[in-house]
UniProtKB/Swiss-Prot annotation:
The record marks 111 as: Important for acyl-CoA specificity. InterPro entries: Class_I_gatase-like, HST_MetA, MetA_family. This is Homoserine O-succinyltransferase. Pfam families: HTS (PF04204). GO terms for cellular component: cytoplasm. CDD domains: GATase1_HTS. NCBIfam families: metA (TIGR01001). PANTHER family: HOMOSERINE O-SUCCINYLTRANSFERASE. It is found in: Cytoplasm. It comes from the Bacteria. The gene is metAS. Substrate binds at residues 163, 192, 249. GO terms for biological process: L-methionine biosynthetic process from homoserine via O-succinyl-L-homoserine and cystathionine. Pathway: Amino-acid biosynthesis; L-methionine biosynthesis via de novo pathway; O-succinyl-L-homoserine from L-homoserine: step 1/1. It comes from Blochmanniella pennsylvanica (strain BPEN).
Length: 304
Protein backbone atom coordinates (compact mmCIF):
# COMPACT_ATOMS: atom_id res chain seq x y z
CA UNK A 1 0.00 0.00 0.00
CA UNK A 2 1.19 3.58 -0.58
CA UNK A 3 2.50 6.34 1.59
CA UNK A 4 0.72 9.65 1.08
CA UNK A 5 2.84 12.81 0.96
CA UNK A 6 2.38 16.40 -0.16
CA UNK A 7 2.48 17.17 -3.88
CA UNK A 8 5.95 17.73 -5.37
CA UNK A 9 7.90 16.41 -2.36
CA UNK A 10 11.36 15.53 -3.82
CA UNK A 11 11.20 12.03 -2.35
CA UNK A 12 8.32 11.15 -4.70
CA UNK A 13 10.42 10.84 -7.84
CA UNK A 14 13.21 8.95 -6.07
CA UNK A 15 10.85 6.42 -4.51
CA UNK A 16 8.80 5.96 -7.67
CA UNK A 17 12.03 5.12 -9.52
CA UNK A 18 12.44 2.34 -6.94
CA UNK A 19 8.89 1.09 -7.69
CA UNK A 20 7.59 2.40 -4.37
CA UNK A 21 3.88 3.30 -4.51
CA UNK A 22 3.56 6.96 -3.47
CA UNK A 23 0.30 8.95 -3.46
CA UNK A 24 0.32 12.74 -3.64
CA UNK A 25 -2.04 15.00 -1.72
CA UNK A 26 -2.66 18.70 -1.20
CA UNK A 27 -2.62 20.34 2.21
CA UNK A 28 -6.43 20.33 2.14
CA UNK A 29 -6.85 16.66 1.24
CA UNK A 30 -9.21 14.88 3.62
CA UNK A 31 -7.58 11.77 5.05
CA UNK A 32 -9.37 8.52 4.39
CA UNK A 33 -10.35 6.73 7.56
CA UNK A 34 -8.37 3.66 6.50
CA UNK A 35 -5.08 5.57 6.51
CA UNK A 36 -2.73 5.66 9.47
CA UNK A 37 -1.61 9.18 10.34
CA UNK A 38 2.14 9.30 11.01
CA UNK A 39 3.93 12.49 12.05
CA UNK A 40 7.69 12.84 11.46
CA UNK A 41 9.82 15.39 13.34
CA UNK A 42 12.89 15.56 11.12
CA UNK A 43 15.89 16.97 13.00
CA UNK A 44 18.61 15.57 10.74
CA UNK A 45 20.85 18.04 8.83
CA UNK A 46 20.12 16.59 5.38
CA UNK A 47 16.36 16.57 5.74
CA UNK A 48 15.51 15.59 2.17
CA UNK A 49 17.85 12.58 2.38
CA UNK A 50 16.26 11.53 5.68
CA UNK A 51 12.78 11.90 4.18
CA UNK A 52 13.78 9.49 1.42
CA UNK A 53 15.18 6.98 3.90
CA UNK A 54 12.18 6.97 6.23
CA UNK A 55 9.53 6.98 3.51
CA UNK A 56 11.27 4.05 1.84
CA UNK A 57 10.97 2.01 5.05
CA UNK A 58 7.42 3.11 5.84
CA UNK A 59 6.24 2.15 2.36
CA UNK A 60 7.16 -1.51 2.87
CA UNK A 61 3.85 -2.36 4.53
CA UNK A 62 0.33 -3.40 3.47
CA UNK A 63 -0.96 -0.35 5.35
CA UNK A 64 -1.83 2.99 3.79
CA UNK A 65 0.02 5.74 5.63
CA UNK A 66 -0.68 9.46 5.60
CA UNK A 67 2.61 11.27 6.29
CA UNK A 68 2.88 14.71 7.91
CA UNK A 69 6.34 16.30 8.21
CA UNK A 70 6.97 18.58 11.20
CA UNK A 71 9.53 21.37 11.63
CA UNK A 72 10.81 23.34 14.60
CA UNK A 73 9.79 26.98 14.20
CA UNK A 74 12.55 29.55 14.57
CA UNK A 75 15.33 27.10 13.66
CA UNK A 76 17.02 27.88 10.32
CA UNK A 77 18.58 24.73 8.81
CA UNK A 78 21.98 24.97 7.12
CA UNK A 79 21.61 22.08 4.70
CA UNK A 80 17.97 22.29 3.58
CA UNK A 81 16.31 25.19 1.71
CA UNK A 82 13.88 27.14 3.87
CA UNK A 83 11.44 26.96 0.95
CA UNK A 84 11.41 23.18 1.27
CA UNK A 85 10.38 23.40 4.93
CA UNK A 86 7.74 26.03 4.19
CA UNK A 87 6.28 23.96 1.34
CA UNK A 88 6.29 20.48 2.85
CA UNK A 89 6.47 20.83 6.65
CA UNK A 90 3.96 22.01 9.21
CA UNK A 91 4.69 23.74 12.51
CA UNK A 92 3.57 22.71 15.98
CA UNK A 93 0.66 25.20 16.16
CA UNK A 94 -0.74 23.54 13.02
CA UNK A 95 -1.09 20.17 14.76
CA UNK A 96 -1.39 21.10 18.44
CA UNK A 97 -5.05 20.06 18.65
CA UNK A 98 -4.78 17.01 16.39
CA UNK A 99 -4.14 13.35 17.16
CA UNK A 100 -1.83 11.02 15.24
CA UNK A 101 -1.43 7.27 15.16
CA UNK A 102 2.37 7.36 15.13
CA UNK A 103 5.26 9.76 15.61
CA UNK A 104 8.88 9.35 14.48
CA UNK A 105 11.51 11.66 15.97
CA UNK A 106 14.82 11.45 14.11
CA UNK A 107 18.34 11.83 15.36
CA UNK A 108 20.22 15.13 15.33
CA UNK A 109 23.93 16.12 15.43
CA UNK A 110 23.62 17.40 19.00
CA UNK A 111 25.34 14.67 20.98
CA UNK A 112 28.03 16.98 22.42
CA UNK A 113 25.72 19.90 23.23
CA UNK A 114 24.05 20.18 26.62
CA UNK A 115 20.28 20.20 26.43
CA UNK A 116 19.99 23.69 27.95
CA UNK A 117 22.28 25.06 25.23
CA UNK A 118 20.09 23.79 22.39
CA UNK A 119 18.14 26.80 21.14
CA UNK A 120 14.97 24.81 20.45
CA UNK A 121 15.10 22.59 23.56
CA UNK A 122 11.90 24.13 25.02
CA UNK A 123 10.05 23.14 21.82
CA UNK A 124 11.39 19.58 22.12
CA UNK A 125 10.15 19.33 25.70
CA UNK A 126 6.76 20.72 24.72
CA UNK A 127 6.40 18.33 21.79
CA UNK A 128 7.37 15.20 23.76
CA UNK A 129 4.93 15.98 26.56
CA UNK A 130 2.20 16.79 24.03
CA UNK A 131 2.91 13.55 22.15
CA UNK A 132 2.16 11.41 25.20
CA UNK A 133 -1.43 12.71 25.06
CA UNK A 134 -1.92 12.88 21.29
CA UNK A 135 0.08 10.01 19.74
CA UNK A 136 -0.64 6.28 19.98
CA UNK A 137 2.96 5.09 19.43
CA UNK A 138 6.21 7.07 19.37
CA UNK A 139 9.49 5.98 17.77
CA UNK A 140 12.65 7.79 18.90
CA UNK A 141 15.88 7.42 16.87
CA UNK A 142 19.46 8.00 18.10
CA UNK A 143 19.79 11.50 19.66
CA UNK A 144 16.01 11.62 20.08
CA UNK A 145 16.38 8.65 22.46
CA UNK A 146 18.68 10.67 24.70
CA UNK A 147 16.35 13.67 24.55
CA UNK A 148 13.28 11.56 25.34
CA UNK A 149 14.98 9.86 28.28
CA UNK A 150 15.65 13.31 29.72
CA UNK A 151 12.17 14.72 29.14
CA UNK A 152 10.10 11.62 29.93
CA UNK A 153 12.28 9.88 32.53
CA UNK A 154 14.50 12.72 33.80
CA UNK A 155 17.66 10.76 33.01
CA UNK A 156 20.88 12.78 32.72
CA UNK A 157 22.89 12.94 29.52
CA UNK A 158 25.61 10.28 29.14
CA UNK A 159 28.33 10.92 26.55
CA UNK A 160 31.06 8.67 25.17
CA UNK A 161 34.65 9.90 25.03
CA UNK A 162 34.85 8.86 21.39
CA UNK A 163 32.11 8.69 18.82
CA UNK A 164 30.54 5.28 18.28
CA UNK A 165 30.34 4.85 14.53
CA UNK A 166 30.11 1.78 12.33
CA UNK A 167 28.07 -1.34 11.62
CA UNK A 168 27.70 -3.56 14.68
CA UNK A 169 26.34 -7.01 15.36
CA UNK A 170 23.34 -7.12 17.68
CA UNK A 171 21.64 -9.86 19.66
CA UNK A 172 17.87 -10.22 19.94
CA UNK A 173 17.18 -10.56 23.67
CA UNK A 174 13.39 -10.85 23.62
CA UNK A 175 12.31 -12.73 20.51
CA UNK A 176 8.73 -12.98 21.79
CA UNK A 177 8.07 -9.24 21.61
CA UNK A 178 6.01 -8.26 18.59
CA UNK A 179 8.55 -5.56 17.75
CA UNK A 180 11.25 -8.21 17.26
CA UNK A 181 8.98 -10.72 15.52
CA UNK A 182 10.93 -12.35 12.71
CA UNK A 183 14.29 -10.90 13.83
CA UNK A 184 17.34 -13.09 13.40
CA UNK A 185 19.06 -13.98 16.66
CA UNK A 186 21.97 -11.88 15.41
CA UNK A 187 21.64 -8.93 13.02
CA UNK A 188 23.58 -5.87 11.88
CA UNK A 189 22.68 -2.20 12.27
CA UNK A 190 24.50 1.15 11.94
CA UNK A 191 25.35 3.54 14.77
CA UNK A 192 26.67 7.09 14.63
CA UNK A 193 26.54 8.81 18.01
CA UNK A 194 28.29 10.20 21.05
CA UNK A 195 25.33 9.35 23.27
CA UNK A 196 25.69 6.49 25.72
CA UNK A 197 22.90 4.46 27.31
CA UNK A 198 24.18 2.53 30.36
CA UNK A 199 22.05 -0.56 30.93
CA UNK A 200 22.22 -0.38 34.72
CA UNK A 201 20.99 3.23 34.73
CA UNK A 202 18.13 2.37 32.38
CA UNK A 203 17.02 -0.64 34.41
CA UNK A 204 17.19 1.20 37.74
CA UNK A 205 15.46 4.40 36.67
CA UNK A 206 12.94 3.54 33.95
CA UNK A 207 10.31 0.97 33.04
CA UNK A 208 12.09 0.25 29.75
CA UNK A 209 12.86 -3.25 28.52
CA UNK A 210 15.91 -3.79 26.33
CA UNK A 211 14.81 -5.95 23.41
CA UNK A 212 18.10 -6.03 21.48
CA UNK A 213 21.67 -5.04 22.26
CA UNK A 214 25.23 -5.17 20.95
CA UNK A 215 28.40 -6.22 22.73
CA UNK A 216 30.17 -3.24 21.15
CA UNK A 217 27.39 -0.66 20.84
CA UNK A 218 25.33 -1.45 23.94
CA UNK A 219 21.55 -1.17 24.22
CA UNK A 220 19.93 -0.82 20.80
CA UNK A 221 16.18 -1.40 20.94
CA UNK A 222 14.10 -0.48 24.01
CA UNK A 223 10.39 -0.30 24.78
CA UNK A 224 8.29 1.12 27.59
CA UNK A 225 6.09 -1.10 29.73
CA UNK A 226 2.91 0.24 28.11
CA UNK A 227 4.52 -0.44 24.69
CA UNK A 228 3.78 3.09 23.42
CA UNK A 229 7.36 4.38 23.53
CA UNK A 230 10.02 2.71 21.37
CA UNK A 231 13.67 3.72 21.34
CA UNK A 232 16.28 2.91 18.66
CA UNK A 233 19.77 4.05 19.62
CA UNK A 234 21.21 3.39 16.15
CA UNK A 235 20.34 4.42 12.60
CA UNK A 236 18.67 1.50 10.78
CA UNK A 237 17.24 3.99 8.27
CA UNK A 238 20.71 4.88 6.93
CA UNK A 239 21.58 4.19 3.30
CA UNK A 240 24.71 2.28 2.32
CA UNK A 241 26.71 5.48 1.81
CA UNK A 242 25.49 7.61 4.74
CA UNK A 243 28.33 6.75 7.12
CA UNK A 244 30.80 7.31 4.29
CA UNK A 245 29.34 10.76 3.63
CA UNK A 246 29.58 11.62 7.33
CA UNK A 247 33.19 10.40 7.45
CA UNK A 248 34.32 12.50 4.48
CA UNK A 249 32.33 15.50 5.74
CA UNK A 250 34.20 15.39 9.05
CA UNK A 251 37.52 14.93 7.24
CA UNK A 252 36.90 18.15 5.29
CA UNK A 253 36.09 19.91 8.56
CA UNK A 254 39.45 18.83 9.98
CA UNK A 255 37.87 16.79 12.77
CA UNK A 256 40.11 13.70 12.33
CA UNK A 257 37.13 11.33 12.39
CA UNK A 258 37.46 7.73 13.41
CA UNK A 259 37.13 5.23 10.57
CA UNK A 260 33.69 3.58 10.97
CA UNK A 261 33.97 0.09 12.46
CA UNK A 262 33.14 -2.93 10.27
CA UNK A 263 31.99 -0.68 7.42
CA UNK A 264 34.44 -0.06 4.59
CA UNK A 265 35.68 -3.22 2.83
CA UNK A 266 39.15 -4.06 4.21
CA UNK A 267 38.84 -0.84 6.29
CA UNK A 268 39.70 1.05 3.13
CA UNK A 269 37.64 4.26 2.80
CA UNK A 270 38.34 4.28 -0.94
CA UNK A 271 36.26 1.12 -1.37
CA UNK A 272 32.47 1.26 -1.68
CA UNK A 273 30.63 -0.15 1.37
CA UNK A 274 27.76 -2.61 1.01
CA UNK A 275 24.49 -2.38 2.89
CA UNK A 276 24.07 -5.30 5.30
CA UNK A 277 21.15 -4.12 7.46
CA UNK A 278 18.39 -3.43 4.93
CA UNK A 279 16.20 -6.44 5.78
CA UNK A 280 16.46 -5.66 9.50
CA UNK A 281 15.41 -2.05 8.93
CA UNK A 282 12.41 -2.99 6.79
CA UNK A 283 11.24 -5.59 9.32
CA UNK A 284 11.68 -3.27 12.30
CA UNK A 285 9.56 -0.51 10.76
CA UNK A 286 6.96 -2.96 9.45
CA UNK A 287 6.59 -4.50 12.92
CA UNK A 288 6.23 -1.05 14.47
CA UNK A 289 3.48 -0.08 12.03
CA UNK A 290 1.63 -3.41 12.14
CA UNK A 291 1.78 -4.26 15.84
CA UNK A 292 2.04 -0.92 17.63
CA UNK A 293 0.70 1.88 15.45
CA UNK A 294 -2.18 -0.02 13.81
CA UNK A 295 -3.01 -2.30 16.75
CA UNK A 296 -3.23 0.65 19.13
CA UNK A 297 -5.68 2.27 16.72
CA UNK A 298 -7.79 -0.92 16.64
CA UNK A 299 -7.76 -1.13 20.45
CA UNK A 300 -8.80 2.51 20.69
CA UNK A 301 -11.68 2.03 18.25
CA UNK A 302 -12.86 -1.15 19.97
CA UNK A 303 -13.12 0.70 23.28
CA UNK A 304 -16.06 2.76 22.02
Amino acid sequence: MPVQVLNRLPAIKILQNEDVFVMQKSRNTFKEQSSLKVLILNLMPKKIETENQLLRLLSNSPLQIDIQLLRIDGHIPKNTPVEHLNNFYCSFPDIRYKNFDGLIVTGAPLGLINFENITFWPQIEQLFLWAKEHINSILFICWAVQAALKVLYNLPKFTRKRKLVGIYQHNTINSHALLTKGFDEKFLAPHSRYSDFPKDIIYRNTDLEILAESDEAGAYLLMSQDKRLIFITGHPEYDAMTLSQEYYRDLKLGLSPKLPDHYFPQDNPNLVPKISWRSHAYLLFANWLNYYVQQNVIKHLSSF
